[in-house]
Amino acid sequence: MSRYEKLFSSLAARKEGAFVPFIMLSDPNPDTALAIVRAAVAGGADALELGVPFSDPVADGPTIQASHIRALAGGATVDSAIEQIRRIRNEFPDLPIGMLIYGNVPFTRGLETFYSEFQEAGADSILLPDVPVREGAPFVAAAEKAGIDPIFIAPAQASEQTLQGVAQYSKGYIYAISRDGVTGTEKESETRGLDEVVNNVKRFGGAPILLGFGISTPQHVADAIAAGAAGAITGSALTKIVDAHLDEEGRPADGLAAAVTGFVSKMKAATKHAES
């Protein structure tokens, strides 16, 4: 069984959903990013979604765009991201690690090299947010050859053909988005329509569904699971906490780890009070 399969099986047995925080590697520097990861795991994170900083993050809203910029300003590279994954994997051998990486990176490094080096570092899955499933065939082939689960986004207003492709080719989990657009708490999830979003994806079977985009409160998490999702992913709300605990020079304040742990703990608790 893969780490994702073990996780979702264990959570289902306990009647819990998954809470997965998104954390930008190298933001504001590798050591602080690792401290944020540790704090999130201490708060009960079931898996991680880790971002690799990129200069043109088209799927992200202002908060996570700023995180990309901070990390790049500090000298972030793909190689440093890979080294951070190794460190995280060594500390947390059983934790599923998903990557969110823009499609220019695998093109630059070569598909086979890209997937194999992330797999060797300890990543379980890779989501390329700017690569739709209709363009995914070469990425899926390279990912599966390397032993990486390819992840695709199921847009809120996707066609049946798109959803069928997402269900067919996503392994590990399916990233369903609660509303179309970019990431961010500026536009919170349309919780009243979550049942429809989840059911549209579920019709085609496939991997467990994690709901993302605009998930910023424990109630959003509970609503996602009540709608039938296997869990929820939060990025911008956590990134705002990081941003609020950095000084003008980008140095972390003493309370950063405690704030991250507290936030994740509350979000994780919401996975235990809703029936999927």
Swiss-Prot record:
GO cellular component, one term: cytosol
CDD domains referenced in this protein's UniProt entry, alphabetically: Tryptophan_synthase_alpha
GO molecular function annotations of the record: tryptophan synthase activity
Keywords tagged on the record: Amino-acid biosynthesis, Aromatic amino acid biosynthesis, Lyase, Tryptophan biosynthesis
Enzyme class, first EC level, given as a word: lyase
Gene that produces this protein: trpA
Enzyme nomenclature, EC number: 4.2.1.20
Functional description taken from the UniProt entry: The alpha subunit is responsible for the aldol cleavage of indoleglycerol phosphate to indole and glyceraldehyde 3-phosphate.
Record's protein name: Tryptophan synthase alpha chain
Pathway: Amino-acid biosynthesis; L-tryptophan biosynthesis; L-tryptophan from chorismate: step 5/5
